[in-house]
Amino acid sequence: LNLLEIIDNPLQDIPLAAVMYSPIGHFSSEELAVIRAEEPPSQCKHLYDAATSFAQKYSDPTDAKNKESCHELAGRLRTFFNQLETYRRKSRYLLLRELLVYVLEDSGYYEFISAMPGAATRKANLDMLLERAGAFEKTSYQGVFQFVRYINSLKKYSVDYASAQELAQNQ
């Protein structure tokens, strides 16, 4: 859900940090700290602004002031934000379920969770999310923002259609 939240609005610091730190972003906590230390909140209010500023600042490998590690990190940031921008662009014309399938395939996240402990439950959770996205598309609401609100309201009111763990065990 964090990825959906930043597809909708990348200026949300907590979801952005979570995705950057996740297997989708592959950034370490130390790298996130370097980015934030280089671009403190007094200069860049949001992590997104700090990270894009860092990526631009260290983009030139021929600049002697640019440390090799910073240049490499800047390149990874540019790749990450290009991928995010692709998802944001696709969110404008793909159906929600199609977008989710695309993101899961493109990011390799579905394959990643398949190799983790509890893979069946994790896959069942993603399959349930895809089912809910399909059902959501049949309502009068549309878009990533509305879907995130819908899922958050389900969590808030503890609505659970079925345990993903039970579904995984039945497969």
Regions from the PLM with identified roles:
Residues 2-171:
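Conserved helicase C-terminal RecA-like lobe
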